[in-house]
Amino acid sequence: MKRCLKFFFLIFALSASVVLRADTDAEVSARKDALELAGAFGNDGFKIRDGHSCGVLKSHDHALVTVNLYAGNQYWFSVGTAEPLKKVGVSVYDETGSKMTTENFSDGDKAAAGFAPENSGQYFVSVDSVEDQEGSFCLVYSYK
């Protein structure tokens, strides 16, 4: 009985020490908007990549997300936002910090950047708060 009790206590202690961060309602709303925008690119043959990056942007701040991209593929980086954050910009930088030329889309609380890398490697996607607002955002990306 003591052994069973020790085992139960050990499992309880381990499970209590693991803290999982739950998505907030604002992040869920932002992800919904980002997936809706990314779904529109699906009509052109783009597939949505598993996973997403959510966070909170302060006013006139940015968030960087590291991605590995492959030459010959095309990518769309779609961002949705939640109130009070209404307007964001999306930019792509290479590993040296040079800003890449992208095709941009912006519509209210959604924005996207399209990019086709000439070289495979690590790139950085910047999500920027362009107005004096802060709030939640979510980034998803598509490829073909």
Locate each region found by the language model.
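Glycine-rich phosphate-binding "P-loop"
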Residues: 41-57
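Acidic, Ser/Thr/Pro-rich low-complexity intrinsically disordered segments
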Residues: 23-25, 52-136, 142-144
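Hydrophobic alpha-helical segments of integral membrane proteins
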Residues: 17-21
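Predominantly extracellular/luminal regions of secreted and cell-surface proteins
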Residues: 22-46
